[in-house]
Amino acid sequence: MRELVDDFIEMNQAGLVLELCEKLYDEDVVMLNNGTIFAESMREAYDKQKRFIGSIKEFDVKLVSEVIDGNVSELIFHYKMTGADSILFDFTGKHVQTWKNGKIVREEYFSVEKI
C-alpha cells in the first residue's frame, strides 16, 4: 500500500489529477467533499475534476502530513493554484482514503484551516 499512496502523492503534487483518477480510483469509488457526495464513480469524479483542472494554469501542491493505518490513508496537502483568469486558489485539504485491491474505493475530502 505504501507504493500506491506514494504514487498518489507524487501524481497529485505533479498536477496529474486526471491521470491519478484513472489509475488509482476504483470504478465504483464514492467520493465526498466536506460531507456531501461529490461523485459515485471514477468516471463522474474524472468528469468533474476535468472541468476544474482545465481552468488551472499553475499548480503548486505540497504534502503537509501523511498517515497510513491498515487500508486507510490520511493525506493533508496545501494547494496553491492559479486559474487562467489569474485568480489564486490557496487552501489546505485532507484526503481520507479507503483502499481495497490496490484502488481507492472511498475518499472523504475535508477543507481544513491553513497550516
Regions found by a protein language model. Name each.
Residues 1-27:
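Short acidic-aromatic low-complexity motifs
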Residues 18, 22-69:
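A solvent-exposed, acidic/Ser-Thr-rich amphipathic alpha-helical stretch
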Residues 25, 79-81, 95, 111:
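Short beta-strand segments enriched in hydrophobic/aromatic residues
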Residues 30, 87, 103-105:
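Residue-level signal for well-ordered, solvent-exposed loop/turn and beta-edge residues enriched
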Residues 55, 80-90:
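Short, cysteine-centered beta-strand-loop-beta hairpins and adjacent loop/turn segments enriched
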Residues 60-61, 76, 89-95, 108:
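Short, surface-exposed coil-to-beta transition loops
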Residues 69-79:
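A short hydrophobic beta-strand element
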Residues 92-115:
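Short beta-strand edge/turn micro-motifs at domain boundaries
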